[in-house]
Design a protein with these regions (language model features):
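Short, Lys/Arg-enriched N-terminal segments with co-localized hydrophobic residues
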Residues: 1-10
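Conserved N-terminal Rossmann-fold NAD(P)-binding element of oxidoreductases
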Residues: 14-18
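N-terminal Rossmann NAD(P)H-binding glycine-rich loop of SDR-like oxidoreductase domains
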Residues: 20, 24-28
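NAD(P)-binding Rossmann-fold cofactor-contacting core
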Residues: 33-58
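Hydrophobic beta-strand scaffold residues
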Residues: 39, 104-105
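Short acidic-hydrophobic, aromatic-tinged amphipathic segments that line or gate anion-handling sites
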Residues: 64-68
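Beta-loop-alpha module in the N-terminal Rossmann-like domain of NAD(P)-dependent dehydrogenases
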Residues: 70-71, 76-97, 110-114
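Rossmann-fold NAD(P)-binding glycine/threonine-rich loop
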Residues: 95-100, 107-126
């Protein structure tokens, strides 16, 4: 076994939702620069089809920006999605991601206590 093959197996696969926004672009850069993480995609309906790295202001990464969570769930399932979208969509998106067994890091404010409790329960079930 190649010595780096072991590392690739255990790298955390990360996708960024809201990857075209200010915070999302910073998360893309941070994930790209972390040797323990591998960036597998970005989601932003206004930047769909563009290279995730180019949108973030770094080199092209050969990773195409997706338009929606639904596109991702059927293709390139990450281990974790970091979400920097907005309160209008975060709750439904987080329910979809957690129900699909994807860990979620939410950087968006605006969830009610009841919504946070429900997301916690869904995450614990999956």
């Amino acid at each position: 076994m190649h010595p780096l093959a072991f590392l690739e197996v255990y790298m955390i696969r990360v996708m960024v939702n809201g990857a075209g926004g200010k915070m999302g672009r910073e998360v893309v850069k941070a994930v790209h620069n972390d040797p323990e993480l591998t960036l597998v995609g970005g989601i932003d309906p206004t930047k769909a089809g563009q290279d995730v790295g180019s949108v973030a202001g770094i080199e092209q990464l050969g990773i195409t920006m997706n338009a929606s969570i639904d596109e991702v769930l059927g293709t390139n399932k990450p281990d974790v999605i970091v979400d920097f979208t907005n309160p209008a969509v975060i709750y439904e998106n987080a329910k979809k991601m957690l129900s699909a067994g994807i860990h979620v890091v939410i950087g968006t404010t605006g969830l009610t206590a009841e919504q946070r409790d429900e997301l916690d329960a869904i995450g614990r079930q999956n």
